[in-house]
A protein has these predicted regions:
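Short, aromatic-rich membrane-interface segments at the entry and exit
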Residues: 97-100, 118-120, 134
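Secretory targeting signals
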Residues: 12-91, 129-140
Length: 160
């Protein structure tokens, strides 16, 4: 028999792992197929001189594979964190009528702040990933707070 702490930690680990791999595997397969079909992705859909005026955009188009993989990893990591936050809330609030709005609010806050988390998940924009550092940290922080709140609620007050 496992204790409450171990049960909660294993569920968070499983949730993060499943969410992470559900996102990363199809994205990497898609990247591989696009790389094969389009012969390495050497086509640049814009004027090179225009790209030089936007250094961040030029840099991402100069190293497309690196930036694609970087954004896939960031997207999958954030998806894993959000999945863990939602799982933690599901453990703390078994009533679905409370759970669905709470999970939605967590994601809505992430998309409503400026700059939005959506921009951090979109490669090949004029903004570098560092432009979204605060947003990424904020999203991770609110989901960690959800996990910690749920941890204390589940382990201290609920029967598991």
């Amino acid at each position: 028999k496992r204790g409450k702490n171990k049960y909660f930690a294993l569920n968070m680990l499983k949730s993060f792992t499943v969410s992470f791999f559900v996102l990363i595997i199809p994205l990497l397969l898609n990247l591989l197929m696009v790389h094969i079909v389009f012969a390495g992705g050497t086509y640049i859909p814009a004027d090179v001189e225009m790209l030089k005026s936007e250094p961040n955009l030029f840099q991402s188009y100069s190293n497309p594979m690196f930036y694609n993989i970087l954004y896939i990893l960031v997207f999958s990591f954030i998806g894993g964190i959000v999945g863990s936050g939602a799982t933690a809330l599901a453990m703390a609030f078994p009533n679905r009528f409370i759970l669905y709005p709470l999970a939605f609010i967590l994601w809505y806050i992430s998309t409503a702040i400026k700059p939005s988390i959506i921009g951090a998940l979109t490669p090949f924009t004029v903004y570098p990933l560092s432009h979204y550092t605060f947003t990424i940290i904020f999203v991770v922080a609110i989901n960690i707070v959800a996990v910690l709140f749920s941890f204390f609620k589940v382990t201290k007050y609920d029967q598991v």
